[in-house]
């Protein structure tokens, strides 16, 4: 009889805990998504805007895929004007500037991607910060 009570207690615990953890994860995703959407809405009003040698030309969030994407174009450089190691160096900088954010440095599933293009609009680099990149 004692073992049956123990099994029932374990089943109740598992039955309650698993859905509850899914609810917490779901609520966290909803909070992050809402915050990202609000930020995108505000920043979109400013686009295009200058950011040093670049112009920010796009920002979006995909809550289903959990990705915040920004896009910028260099004001002067064409694709061939960028150094060969630009992708590698820019990835290091992107990681450094975004991995202090708990949304990306913990296992939330969220990532931030930036597309860097030359002045003609050709892709030069695609950089990402997420839990796996921030854990390297």
State where each predicted segment sits.
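Positively charged n-region of N-terminal signal peptides that target proteins for export
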Residues: 1-6
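Short, non-transmembrane amphipathic alpha-helical segments
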Residues: 81-105
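Sec/Tat signal peptide C-region and signal peptidase I cleavage site
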Residues: 20-25
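Bacterial N-terminal signal peptides
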Residues: 8-19
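Polar/charged, Gly/Pro-rich intrinsically disordered segments
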Residues: 29, 41-42, 47-77, 104-136
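Immediate post-signal-peptide N-terminus of mature secreted/exported proteins
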Residues: 26-38
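Short, non-transmembrane alpha-helical segments in secretory-pathway proteins
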Residues: 38-40, 93
């Amino acid at each position: 009889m004692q073992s049956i009570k123990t099994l029932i207690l374990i089943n109740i615990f598992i039955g309650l805990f698993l859905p509850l953890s899914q609810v917490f994860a779901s609520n966290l995703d909803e909070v992050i998504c809402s915050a990202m959407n609000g930020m995108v809405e505000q920043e979109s009003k400013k686009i295009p805007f200058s950011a040093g040698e670049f112009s920010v030309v796009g920002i979006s969030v995909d809550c289903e895929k959990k990705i915040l994407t920004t896009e910028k174009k260099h004001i002067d450089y064409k694709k061939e004007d960028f150094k060969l190691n630009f992708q590698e160096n820019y990835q290091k900088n992107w990681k450094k500037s975004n991995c202090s954010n708990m949304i990306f440095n913990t296992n939330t599933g969220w990532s931030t991607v930036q597309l860097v293009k030359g002045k003609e609009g050709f892709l030069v680099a695609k950089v990402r910060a997420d839990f796996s990149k921030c854990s390297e």
